[in-house]
UniProtKB/Swiss-Prot annotation:
It comes from Borrelia turicatae (strain 91E135). This is Large ribosomal subunit protein bL27. InterPro entries: Ribosomal_bL27, Ribosomal_bL27_CS. GO terms for cellular component: cytosolic large ribosomal subunit. GO terms for molecular function: structural constituent of ribosome. The gene is rpmA. Belongs to the bacterial ribosomal protein bL27 family. Residues 1-26 are annotated as: Disordered. It holds the Pfam family Ribosomal_L27.
Length: 81
């Protein structure tokens, strides 16, 4: 028979890896075609002129140009001008 009571296992001690989401290029910054501008979950930002929307809602540049963030009717759009 054990002389000391066995200790219980902890329910803590886990952490998920970060997903590295967010804005990668700011307004007024020059981008090349194919560069990622925003990584997001859902469409917090919507695609505008010369920008594309990936399967995971990533917004990327379709042409070389300057990033422009614009708000219209309560939605945030990303244009490449």
């Amino acid at each position: 028979m054990a002389t000391s009571k066995s200790g219980g296992s902890s329910k803590n001690g886990r952490d998920s890896i970060s997903k590295r989401l967010g804005v990668k290029r700011s307004g007024g910054q020059f981008v090349r075609s194919g560069e990622i501008i925003v990584r997001q979950r859902g469409t917090k930002f919507h695609k505008g002129k010369n920008s594309g929307l990936g399967r995971d809602h990533t917004i990327f540049a379709l042409k070389d140009g300057v990033v422009e963030f614009k708000t219209s009717k309560g939605r945030k759009y990303i244009n490449i001008i």
